[in-house]
Regions:
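Ligand-binding clefts of soluble mixed alpha/beta catalytic domains
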Residues: 2-589
Length: 589
């Protein structure tokens, strides 16, 4: 199809980028070495626990085998695969999660990892579940559980069961999604007592394997009710007998919840049947044909995504051309820039992903002569630095977010930032207020947003540039092998913490070396805790992806945004493309 609205705006976007003159093999090798380390950690986490062979021999599939059968080939985008904030021994929080298409419709898919403690709730899992439901909420796409959950890991219940974002919170979130009209569909396998039972019952549609069960309490709980407050031999023997009796009367089987309560909508005899049942109900859900929202035919970028291994420097002190990165991400390497030349530290504008509009904000990299204007006015000269935020850039981003919100265009942020400008010049230029203004603009936009921390995410700039802190907007964030996230550079932090002590010790004639050692230890700690591996493990970003895999994640995000949007702006009623054209025309004269 090639008949689209307003072709003079959307099918004549300027082409950006150019072919590489040479490829930096050394830079690529450094990036790929980190990527390989991430791959190995991810694979080890997936394989930890009971062997795949053992599960298959018992008639069960693994979480990944179930996901592979359920999801359309080539569409799986893992999220939080390295997330393990509580250092669980198996390297994960006991679920496998991501975005994927099911019979052409995007969904958030969360599968219990039945290789580990029969899919038990472990520390960190509740927060990861909430991140998944947040993504479904932001994108207004179905949430699909492939459930096989044995309940709370009881010897760590205090880290799993209670708290504001604890074991019960996802059940409230499922109710919230249902009330928003966002369905939650679950395929239930195995034994699901207590926390697993509520996890089973809280979705919209329940589909079960014939051997599945769900219950308020499992056999162990039912048999272990004792008022004594301790266990003696008599109690132990009674527990043994109760367990023997309960094996023939397991709580919450298909006979109860299909045959009597009717909670199970459908029951299947095999693994494939449950997944086919999920697909059946996904097929019933409303979704726009993406052609409805397209402004152009889908195209691949003009340039190879593998070029990114050469373009993006592994050395954080080296600069590069952000436009060349963008040229490897967007359809046809086309980009309609908003207010080129104003606020030059920020690149803002419209791009296309699979023919669908997306608003883009990215940090320019490199030096900026005679900028910012507030320093020029004071000193008669100035040198701005790409990656830092100044007055004009903050104003421009506020305007751009507001126009994207008005035109209902989802947004992509590409961060490589050292923070917002500091000092009294910056204070007089109102940067503190303008940074918070951008947060206000984002919060009021009600837009779904995706954020990529390409290299540095630093200081308050990491918040204001569409970061994951914007919980009502940010659907998910990703990083790369070059990602670093910290409040400030380690050397800066060491100076901030110890400068006064050095002055005091020097004045007193004391040995400075112990303080110097502490400063260097802090610098090393910052380096460790800002690495891609740590960022993923701690959840500072939702996934570390390969350089050449950024576009598939952007495609998943943009297509999901247009699947079932809450509101629409007709193309011929949009303001942003017209503002871009008029600004460009005015500045040509």
């Amino acid at each position: 199809m090639s008949e689209y609205s307003m072709p003079s705006y959307f099918q004549t976007m300027p082409v950006i980028g150019k072919e590489l003159v040479s490829f930096n093999e050394d830079n690529a090798a450094e990036i790929q070495q980190v990527e390989q380390e991430i791959h190995e950690i991810r694979e080890a986490a997936l394989e930890a626990g009971r062997s795949t062979e053992s599960l298959n021999e018992s008639g069960q599939w693994t979480a990944m085998q179930r996901i592979t059968e359920l999801v359309d080939e080539g569409t799986w985008c893992p999220l939080n695969s390295l997330y393990n904030p509580e250092d669980n021994k198996n390297g994960s929080v006991g679920i496998v999660k991501g975005l994927g298409r099911i019979d052409g419709k995007w969904a958030v898919i969360i599968a219990s990892d039945n290789k580990k403690l029969a899919g038990a709730w472990v520390p960190g899992q509740a927060d990861s579940l909430l991140r998944g439901s947040d993504t479904a909420k932001r994108l207004r796409i179905p949430l699909v559980y492939v459930l096989n959950c044995s309940g709370v890991k009881l010897d760590e219940q205090e880290k799993v069961y209670p708290n504001r974002r604890g074991g019960g919170t996802p059940f409230y979130r499922n109710s919230e999604l249902n009330q928003m009209g966002v369905p939650v569909i679950v395929g239930i396998y195995g034994t699901n007592p207590a926390g697993g039972g509520y996890h089973s019952i809280s979705p919209t549609i329940l589909i079960a394997h014939e051997d599945a069960n769900m219950a308020v309490g499992g056999a162990g709980i039912v048999g272990g009710m004792s008022p004594k407050g301790h266990v003696d031999k008599e109690a132990a023997e009674a527990l043994i007998q109760a367990q023997k009796n309960l094996k023939s009367d397991i709580p919450g089987t298909v006979a109860i919840h299909y045959g009597e309560t009717g909670f199970f909508r459908e029951v299947y005899a095999d693994e494939e049947g449950v997944l086919a049942g999920i697909r059946k109900y996904i097929d019933m859900l409303p979704a726009y044909d993406p052609e409805f929202f397209r402004v152009d035919d889908p195209k691949e970028p003009l340039f190879d995504a593998n070029d990114l291994y050469s373009i993006v420097p592994f050395n954080q002190k080296r600069s590069y051309d952000m436009v060349e990165v963008m040229a490897r991400l967007f359809d046809g390497s086309e980009f309609m820039e908003y207010k080129h030349g104003y606020g030059p530290e920020m690149i803002t504008g419209l791009a296309k992903i699979d023919g669908l509009l997306v608003g883009v904000v990215a940090n320019y990299q490199g030096m900026l002569m005679n900028y910012p204007e507030y320093k020029m006015a004071t000193y008669g000269q100035a040198m701005g630095v790409g990656g830092k935020l100044y007055r004009q850039g903050l104003i421009k981003m506020n305007e751009f977010v507001t126009l994207c919100a008005r035109d209902r265009i989802p947004m992509l942020w590409i961060q490589d930032t050292t923070g917002i400008d500091v000092g009294n010049d910056a204070e007089r230029a109102e940067l503190l207020g303008l940074g918070q203004s951008l947060i206000y603009s984002i919060q009021s936009s009600k837009l779904p947003m995706m954020e990529i921390t390409l290299r540095k995410g630093t200081a308050a700039a990491h918040y204001v540039l569409g970061g994951p802190q914007g919980n009502d907007n940010n659907a998910f964030s990703i990083g790369t092998a070059t990602t670093e996230i910290y409040v400030m550079h380690g050397e800066t932090a060491a100076a901030a913490m110890y400068a006064r002590r050095l002055v005091k010790e020097e004045k007193a004639g004391e040995d400075l070396q112990p303080t110097i050692d502490k400063m260097n230890a802090l610098i090393q700690d910052y380096a460790k805790k800002s690495s891609p591996k740590f960022c993923a493990k701690a959840g500072l970003t939702d996934e570390i992806v390969d350089m050449n895999d950024m576009r598939p994640y952007i495609q998943a995000f943009v297509n999901a945004c247009y699947q079932n949007p809450e509101s629409i702006c007709p193309f011929h009623q949009m303001l942003l493309p017209r503002v871009i054209r008029d600004y460009d025309n005015l500045n040509q004269h």
